[in-house]
Regions:
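Short helix/loop capping segments that flank catalytic or ligand/cofactor-binding pockets
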Residues: 18, 41-42, 87-89
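Hydrophobic anchor at the start of a short beta-strand
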Residues: 30
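HKD (HxKxxxxD) catalytic microenvironment of the phospholipase D
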Residues: 55-134
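Single conserved hydrophobic/aromatic residue that forms the stacking wall/gate
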Residues: 1-13, 17
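Flexible, glycine-rich loop/tail regions that form catalytic "lids" or insertion modules at the edges
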Residues: 11-14, 41-42, 49, 103-182
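HKD-type phospholipase D/PLD-like phosphodiesterase module
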Residues: 33-70
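Phosphate-centric recognition/catalysis
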Residues: 27
Length: 182
């Protein structure tokens, strides 16, 4: 029954929010960069005072699905196909994988840090559900995450072009009948 699925999703969403509130209450600092709707209320005394939610609205419809946690002071980084939307819980098969390669982990953490430092195109979710546009504080560096990533991609494009062409050449099987109907 569709109503049962909707009820299950609502419970799942409430559990996700409740778990973040519990972590905040225990003193865990939580930073969320959410592209769309966010049902969580940040900055409520005793409940979510350690939670900050930002949203970047800019040129690209880009939204990395990065999850970064510190466990006993050690970072654990995951990338995922899922967001925390109804469709991901009810109608899709999604996955999250831990990034173990040190270089990849560092690059992904850099993406997350730059995104959370954006003070040009980011908006901060207030406890009443309104968003306030970020502004750089006087004398601080202006950071626009998508411009930073664009410049970085253009700069690195030249390096990528020098990779050997044969590194990406597909190999055909040595079978006579490959690709023909029998």
């Amino acid at each position: 029954d569709h109503r049962d699925l909707h009820t299950a999703y609502r419970r799942q969403r409430q559990m996700c929010i409740r778990d973040r509130y519990r972590a905040s209450y225990a003193g865990v600092k939580i930073r969320l960069n959410v592209r769309g709707v966010c049902c969580l209320q940040p900055d409520l005394k005793k409940i979510s005072k350690n939670i900050k939610v930002t949203s970047i609205v800019d040129r690209y419809l880009e939204h990395s699905r990065i999850f970064s946690f510190y466990n006993n002071g050690k970072p654990k980084v995951y990338i995922s196909s899922a967001d925390l939307m109804e469709r991901s819980f009810d109608r899709r098969v999604e996955l999250a994988i831990e990034v173990k390669d040190a270089d990849s982990k560092n690059k992904i953490q850099e993406i997350l840090k730059i995104s959370l430092k954006d003070n040009i195109q980011s908006y901060i979710l207030e406890s009443d559900g309104t968003y306030i546009r970020s502004k750089p504080s006087k004398g601080s560096k202006k950071i626009r995450a998508q411009s930073y990533f664009h410049r970085s991609a253009v700069k690195n494009a030249g390096k990528i072009a020098t990779i050997s062409e044969d590194a990406f050449t597909p190999h055909k099987p040595k079978t006579k009948n490959f690709g023909t109907a029998v």
